[in-house]
Amino acid sequence: MGRQGLIHIVILQYKLGGIYPMKAVDIRQMYLEFFKEKGHHHEPSAPLVPINDPSLLWINSGVATLKPYFDGRVIPDNPRITNAQKSIRTNDIENVGKTARHHTFFEMLGNFSIGDYFKKEAIHYAWEFLTDKKWMGFDPELLSITIHPEDQEAYDVWHQEIGIPEERLIRLEGNFWDIGEGPSGPNSEIFYDRGVEYGSDENDPEMYPGGENERYLEIWNLVFSQFNHNPDGTYTPLPKQNIDTGMGLERIVSVVQNVPTNFDTDLFMPIIEKIEEFANRKYKRPSEVDLNEIFGSEEDINTPFKVIADHIRTVAFAIGDGALPSNEGRGYVLRRLLRRAVRYAKQIGIEKPFMFELVPTVGKIMEDFYPEVTEKCEFIQRVIKNEEIRFHETLDGGLAIFNEVAESQKAAGHDFIPGADAFRLYDTYGFPIELTEEYAEEVGMKVDHEGFETAMEEQRERARAARQDVDSMQVQNEVLANLTVASEFVGFDTLVANTEIAAMIVNGQVEKVASEGQEALVILAKTPFYAEMGGQIADSGIISNDSFTAVVKDVQKAPNGQPLHTVIVESGEMHVEDAVQAIVHRDDRNLIIKNHTATHIMQRALKDVLGDHVNQAGSYVGPDRLRFDFSHFGQVTKEELQQIERIVNEKVWDDIEVVIEEMAIDQAKAKGAMALFGEKYGDVVRVVSIGDYSIELCGGIHVKRSSEIGFFKIVSEGGIGAGTRRIEAVTGKVAYEVVKEEEALLNDAAALLKANPKDIVTKVQALQGDYKELQRDNEALSQKIANAHSWGNCRCSTNNWRCHSSFYKSRSKDNNLLRQMMDDLKALMPKAVIVLGAVDGDLSDAMCRGITIINRWQLPCWKYREIWCQKLVVVIGGVRPDMAMAGAKDASKLDEALLSVYDYVKSI
């Protein structure tokens, strides 16, 4: 049996007596099940918007969410991890739709070892999954391997243990994974031979696994993380070697379903079929297209369908995970993707908003593993539809910019559109270079392609530099990672603990003693101090005995989970194994727990008032206030804030019991517990219930009953970024003090207005009415004075060559009055040069108008303004063919400026 026949048998399964290609959902599940059988913990996919990682714009790989494990900041419960992680990358956006496999949204299947197994096991696992008939069942002869030239260990495993012949083991210098500081190492890539129909030219220097060709498709990358890339550029062996692998789901599905591109798989085709309902033509199926047409680098007849299908997946999932379109950051990425998709939609006859109607299809394809798009479908659709409508306006604005640039270039004697402007139209307004070329051709111009490519490459360089900066992991800290002494947190029940010092780090090294004035990191055998987590700040307090006193400045979680106290030794010497007393500051703790419980109630109230799309985007819970960042598309009205505040206070006054329980994660979810979006949880979780109103997974500390909060007061609310808003509030004593401060301000205002506090609004409204009436009287009087002076001055006009010239200076402060005077004088003298000057303190303003001279000679108004400006240090104002304005700070030369225009009129 030939290779092609074997491939078809491998990728087909039997179902109800029929044969069908394995679906993407089956392949994803099969991968995860395989590694769970190998003892791996399945880590759920994190949201695309990074949580607690400001270095990343998007989650862009399977390993991105595991960085704390790889750099040693956190020790996982199970060192073997597997995941299917949704990811976004937009560095090659211009290639999406033109190639078979470029995407902005994709899924990465991965298996990871944090200091457990290494190369041998990773290679054997990969080979078993790909070739065993129980799993993928690929023909081993269709698989080739690339390795780093110096990675003899990997070569020996592949060649001697797996049995890969030398001709299918290719050594490549590029097989080394390194993104800057942090873990790095060689890698092995596995390639699948798709057959001679995808390439058979023996003279093609790129026709080999790892070359630029379509025949040999990379399906899996195994990274052997064995070095630390240090800040000084050197490499040292990692304390613990790691495994990081990645298999693109879209790629492996295209192989299994035997289709030429990722877009022809069941991950994309339902979306493409939905697009066809709106388009004026159909997508060309693989049987209708020659492979040479598919695998070019240029656009083909299917490009618009591919672009739209890819981009709607990205945008729908990103919005579902909390991102919103904007002009900056990740919001700008979404806006750019939507613009690009809508622009391509026009090529297939779609002229109206339609992208939002694709969202249910995206959700349906992915809902078995990613239910969030379906769950938030209505909200996602609303956001996308609004953005589509706005884009059509943006497109018109881009055309206006093009016209301005074209006119400016022609006026300067040029016949081309500068590359920088063409790139601005491309990058900001979504104009493809081809569209700009078409517009340029219509007005007899060309486009500076070299300048455009230069600007494009500069952007790519900035993106590459940014990726190198944001992807790097921290260098592993071996000292902290090796601290495995036990520490028990007892702070849920007490603020004081008699304990002992279990371990100590001074100046980055494990020590036995810390002296007066030194800072140390301390682990206690048991501690009442809460380590900062979930927005709740760390406790402060004292650790002491008869020999020393140390102030606790901060408490964080060590890599192995123990509370790690940062302390300053104020007096004496602190020794490991000292018996000590640890005391938390009671007043601060009491204020913190009131704010924490209030935050839970407020989050539920936000969802009730604004909608279930509200998700936590950040928080701070301290003794002074609570701060809560949340996702929301639009403003929060005054009435909504009042409603939220009222709901929280009602729950406070209801004196609800706060119940804290530990239970299985599935039980908590069944109970309706709200989880922090994107947070990782173990099999057993802590559930905080405030009656049946608020149920959340939370490891923080809370009041016993809601009435202990006392009083809740919102002090501010506003936007802090695209689609993200922030509420700050206070509780208890602090809330009372805020109210008293506002009351004092109200009383001061009432005293100034000579009114009772309850009558302030009425008093201010009356004053505003009086002020508006005075304004109207003042404007009417000013107009009368100006008119009187105007008519008087007109009788002193100069007649020169049948052209009247009128000059006038007043003390009007209002440009509108000058314009009104100009209109009146224009009606009186239709063939006149009129110059008006107004003085306001040390400022002067002028308006001039040029009209027909000798019935056939028309002078533009800017010429008169030019004469005027020669006499004054001016700030140029607006200009029209029949009117111009200018302003100056020195009013002393106003008379001279007026006369200079008069002299010019006489001279012509």
Curated annotation (Swiss-Prot):
InterPro entries membership: aa-tRNA-synth_II/BPL/LPL, Ala-tRNA-lgiase_IIc, Ala-tRNA-ligase_IIc_anticod-bd, Ala-tRNA-synth_IIc_core, Ala-tRNA-synth_IIc_N, Ala-tRNA_ligase, Ala_tRNA_ligase_euk/bac, Thr/Ala-tRNA-synth_IIc_edit
BP terms from Gene Ontology: alanyl-tRNA aminoacylation
Top-level taxon of the source organism: Bacteria
Record field: catalytic activity: tRNA(Ala) + L-alanine + ATP = L-alanyl-tRNA(Ala) + AMP + diphosphate
Keywords, alphabetical: Aminoacyl-tRNA synthetase, ATP-binding, Cytoplasm, Ligase, Metal-binding, Nucleotide-binding, Protein biosynthesis, RNA-binding, tRNA-binding, Zinc
Keyword Glycoprotein included in the entry's annotation: no
Cofactor(s) this protein cannot do without: Zn(2+)
One Pfam family of this chain: tRNA-synt_2c
Binding locations of Zn(2+): 596, 600, 698, 702
Cofactor stoichiometry and binding remark: Binds 1 zinc ion per subunit.
GO molecular function terms listed in the Swiss-Prot or TrEMBL record: alanine-tRNA ligase activity; aminoacyl-tRNA deacylase activity; ATP binding; catalytic activity, acting on a protein; transferase activity; tRNA binding; zinc ion binding
Main location: cytoplasm
Family statement: Belongs to the class-II aminoacyl-tRNA synthetase family.
Domain comment, as recorded: Consists of three domains; the N-terminal catalytic domain, the editing domain and the C-terminal C-Ala domain. The editing domain removes incorrectly charged amino acids, while the C-Ala domain, along with tRNA(Ala), serves as a bridge to cooperatively bring together the editing and aminoacylation centers thus stimulating deacylation of misacylated tRNAs.
Record protein name field: Alanine--tRNA ligase
The species this protein was found in: Lysinibacillus sphaericus (strain C3-41)
The gene coding this protein: alaS
